[in-house]
Every structure is written in C-alpha cells, then in structure tokens.
Regions:
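Bacterial N-terminal signal peptides that target proteins for export
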Residues: 1-8
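Sec/Tat signal peptide C-region and signal peptidase I cleavage site
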Residues: 17-23
Length: 291
C-alpha cells in the first residue's frame, strides 16, 4: 500500500477558447435554434436526445457529493471491489464549482501501487445551474424582454405548472439566478441505468456508466431516486508507483451544461422567443494526476 498526501481542488475551467467543439455543437455568440438542428444521431450530435442544444460552460454549478473514489476498473453501486474510497460523507458536501470549493478529505489515503483507469462519484440528483451567455445580436425571451445577454432566471423545469423557459434575456447578466434541476436517466421512460453515457467536454470524450440509487445505495425505481452513482473512465490513467508522493484531483465543468433553443419543457414553446429557453446538466469531468 502507498500512503499519499491528497490535494482535492474543485476546478472551474473558463475554457471557451480552448474548447475543441465539433461542428454546430458549441454555443456561440451567433447561435440560434437553426444552428443546432438536424444533428440528432450524427457523430457531431450535441447532447441528450433532442436537437436544438449546444454545449456551454456555466458560470456556476452546485452539486452535493456523498462519495468519491479511485478505481482500477469500471465500478457500479453493487460492485466497488476495484475501488478505493477517498471521500465519504453520508450527509453530503455541497460544492459551488464555479467559485471553487474543496471536499474535506483525510490528510492521507492509502492506495495499492498500480494503474487506476476509473473514478467514481456519488452525488445528489438535484443540481443547481447558473449560466450566462452573450450573443452578438439581441435575443427575445418568453416574456418579450430582449437583450444580448441571456441567463438562467431561477425558474426550474421541475416547477408546476411547467414553464415555457428557464432563461430570460436583457442588457446584462446581473439578474442570473440558479435553475434547479432533478436529474433523471431515462427521459420520458424511467431508467435507473445508463451504460456508456458519452459527452464531449472541453474537446475530450468522457465515458461514464450512470446509475440512479436510493439513500441506501441500492438501484432505485421510479419515484425514489436519491443520488446518482457515476463510474467514469479517466482520460489519462493514473499510475501509482513507489515514487508517487500525492494526488491532485479536480472536477472540470467546461462544457458541463447544454443550452436549448425552442425546447418544449412541457407547456409549449413561447412564440417569438429567439434566445435559449433550457439549461441542462450534462456532467462533470474527473481530472486526476499523480505527483
């Protein structure tokens, strides 16, 4: 066993210029509903089962983390034998990824020397997203306000009745507020498992196995989701050797949200809205290096 000093940084990467987006998948100053249509099923497809979405780096994302670990193979809620848990808190720790906050990890962690290809996280299925995007020309929101800035305004897709939009537009983004979202895996049909969920974040394809679980850690059924268990293949494997002194562990939210244009959130689409009307959590990228 190798005892390491562990540094955990929740990293917010402002990375618009270095994001190697694919054709028509990244949100841009000129984006419209037409810019992100017709991509479904193609290699350049932006996101989550519907046309009309583009990748975006949010201003801030709040998540609650219950557990985090490093693994030598893919894991699941019922099979973590390949993993070493680095953080565990049954009450959870809420992190503001846009500001940069840290998990209270132990001073050291023991890892068996070898190659770690995966990591896992258990996080609440309720997230909060704050996003602001600036366009080159004025856009109109669902209440006929207009401006070159569009932003999440505090409404949620979980509201009753359903809103037509969770975003407003104006002359600046100072009124941006968090949009709360309860994450599901199955779209219109409930599912507690999503294998090989793939999303491009910062130009890197991130592959994860996702599971909806109960508070006891078992796979959930419709209506009793408590958290998400995500097993993610690392973009670069972590090698623990006799010379390894510690670990640097980070989350990146670059391209971690998608914005949608002309999306029916359950109450129709507002006539004349030219700005985005939806903001959706897409994922986190684990960035782990040995030193």
């Amino acid at each position: 066993m190798k005892t390491l000093n562990t540094f955990f940084l929740i990293m917010f990467a402002v990375c618009f210029l270095s994001s190697k987006s694919y054709a028509s998948t990244a949100c841009a100053a000129t984006s419209t509903a037409a810019s992100h249509q017709g991509l479904s099923g193609s290699a350049n497809y932006a996101t989550n089962g519907d046309d009309g979405y583009c990748f975006h780096t949010p201003t801030s994302m709040k998540v609650t983390v219950y557990e985090f670990g490093l693994c030598t193979a893919a894991s699941s809620p019922t099979s973590k034998t390949a993993c070493t848990t680095i953080f565990n808190n049954t009450s959870g720790k809420t992190l503001d990824l846009g500001v940069g906050s840290s998990l209270p990890l132990s001073d050291s962690v023991s890892l068996t020397e070898g190659t770690y290809t995966h990591a896992y996280v258990v996080l609440s299925n309720v997230t909060s997203i704050k996003s602001v995007i600036q366009f080159s020309t004025a856009r109109v929101d669902d209440t006929n306000n207009s401006g070159t800035y569009c932003y999440t305004d505090g409404r949620s897709v979980n509201d009753t009745p359903k809103p037509k939009s969770v975003m407003s537009c104006g002359s600046n983004g100072s009124n941006a507020a968090y949009a709360v979202e309860t994450i599901g895996l199955g779209g219109n049909t409930y599912s507690n498992t999503y294998i090989n969920y793939t999303v491009s974040m910062g130009g890197v394809n991130i592959v994860s196995n996702l599971y909806a679980i109960t508070s006891s850690g078992a796979l959930s059924s419709a209506g009793n989701d408590f958290a998400l268990y995500g097993s993610q293949q690392l973009a670069s494997a972590v090698n623990i050797t006799p010379d390894t002194k510690g670990l640097d562990i980070a989350f990146s939210i670059t391209d971690g949200v998608t914005l949608g244009f002309g999306i029916n959130l359950g109450n129709g689409v507002a006539v004349g809205q030219t700005g985005p009307n939806d903001a959706v959590f897409e994922g986190l990228r684990f960035k782990i290096t040995a030193r």
